[in-house]
Regions:
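Short S/T/G/P-rich N-terminal loop/turn motif that feeds into the first structured element of a domain
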Residues: 1-200
Length: 200
């Protein structure tokens, strides 16, 4: 309540481990800069919030928990490489799809342009096949996974329902000649993946 124009905040909790990502979402880089200046700039609010925090929870609230703050990441969403079926209402879909599959992708050297064109071709092919799912593509600005050039985030109602939907999509794709052509010469590899649940 002390922060003006605060960004959207959400948590991502790893399903197969104990990592928690504290996330902030901004609509533009201008919003990021404005937020950081209001927080860390001269007369910024960070010191006031930190003081209130210490009054509420003490000097070392994480003592004994084993919490380890690793690093910060910043990604920008590539709307041109993201997939949303026509007519999708994200205000309705996001709360109903709390599962997130994060896949970090390494693109072969010198093949980034070709990779982007393949992703765009895949989007058009999924439209043709009437594949019904939501996928966001992100590109790291700083941080990110070692070797990861892009991060693909696919949504689902649950992990089980996500993989059920993936199986159906895969069957339609593998039976499609255009999809086979798009995938004929792989130019990227998966670095790692995580299954996460989101809390708004």
């Amino acid at each position: 309540s002390m922060v003006e124009n605060a960004p959207a905040i959400f948590l991502l909790s790893e399903m197969d481990g104990n990592t928690i990502y504290f996330c902030r979402a901004f609509n533009s880089m201008e919003e990021v800069i404005e937020y950081r200046q209001s927080r860390w700039g001269e007369n910024g609010w960070n010191s006031k919030v930190s003081e209130k925090w210490r009054e509420s929870v003490g000097e070392d609230p994480w003592k004994g928990t084993g919490a380890d703050v690793v690093m910060n990441h910043m990604f920008r969403m590539r709307t041109d490489l993201s997939y949303l079926p026509e007519g999708t209402n994200l205000d309705e879909e996001l709360p109903n799809n709390p599962y997130r599959r994060h896949v970090n992708i390494a693109v072969d050297w010198g093949k980034r342009g070709e990779f982007i064109e393949n992703i765009k071709a895949g989007i058009e092919n999924d439209k043709k096949l009437n594949n019904d799912y939501i996928r966001f593509m992100f590109q790291p600005i700083f941080g990110g996974i070692d070797g990861g050039d892009f991060m693909m985030v696919v949504l689902g109602e649950s992990r089980a329902s996500y993989f059920t939907g993936l199986e159906k999509r895969t069957a339609k794709r593998e039976a499609d000649g255009d999809w086979q052509k798009i995938q004929a010469n792989p130019i990227a590899t998966w670095v790692n993946e995580e299954s996460l649940m989101i809390t708004y």
